[in-house]
Amino acid sequence: PAPESFTNAIFERTKTIDRYFELETPDIDLDRLGTVQVGDLTVEIIDPVKDYEALMEELFDFDAIEAGLRDGSLSIRFDALHAITGPYAKRILVERLGAPADAVVNAVPLEDFGGGHPDPNLVHAHELAEWMSRPNAPTLGAASDGDGDRNMIMGADFFVTPSDSLAVLAANLHLLPGYRDGLKGVARSMPT
């Protein structure tokens, strides 16, 4: 989140706006990658999921994860809670790493989050919690919030608190390719 001093400065600047300009133009097809000219402005439509996948492949050992999914030593259940992380999880976990299609649930982003609340906790992600309590539960369960900056991590019938998950991740990041040189620092918010 932006510091309050920054957001206050932006708000103060909005008070000085005395005009704005409009341009009548056809709608831009955001599903077609490439550039579009809109007046004097060039708009570039990118695939953020593809870019994110490339970054994650640099940070994590995709070969090891893929091998674990293939040989059964790793199984995953991810609940996107009908938020923005769904397409990212489908692309990376299912399409790239080979997890079963049903390993990622509630993956289609919906304006109303499917009638639920995209808060990754035992109350709002109760479907995942119930799934992870089954006798043949996956080895790893996870859910994320509406914009993907908070998560819930679970093992088979085991809940990892947000503060513990941050500590576990920080303590073991050196094992990941993208963090072999160490971690510069971590930050936590009030909930963690």
Task: Please place each PLM-identified region on the residue numbering.
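Gly/Ser/Thr-enriched, mixed-charge loops and adjacent short helices
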Residues: 1-136
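Gly/Ser/Thr-rich loops at beta-strand to alpha-helix junctions
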Residues: 81-87, 148-149, 191-192
